[in-house]
Amino acid sequence: MPPQPHLDSDCRGVASILARVGDKWSVFVIMLLGDGPRRFNEIKRMVGGISQRMLTLTLRGLERDGLVTRTVFPTIPPRVDYELTDLGRGLWQPVEALGKWASDHQAEIEDARARFDRRNEPADLPTNRVAR
């Protein structure tokens, strides 16, 4: 079967989805929620370095895309749980595999970066200063 041409609108649609699910914070949140529902502060503690605002934006985006549900329990104080939807659970396995791959190859990537940086750092230029 010959390859089908890509429509610009299809590429833009896929790009917007990949921008959401490929975002580093989304990847961490999806990986965590794969183990079951979690509360906001629990997610924040487990995802090191994420601000409250960024976690809020990430969860809202995932909820908007139908990947996460937000359940408010009528308790005092209110309890809010986040969990993956069926659609989100379908994404969990590839995201988990991506996270595992990154973890397994972290040292190799860091070595490659260091080699690249050494090859591409500007050479020290001699200074033409006159000693006084």
Describe the role of every protein-language-model region.
Residues 35, 75, 86:
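Active-site acidic-Proline motif in GNAT/NAT acetyltransferases
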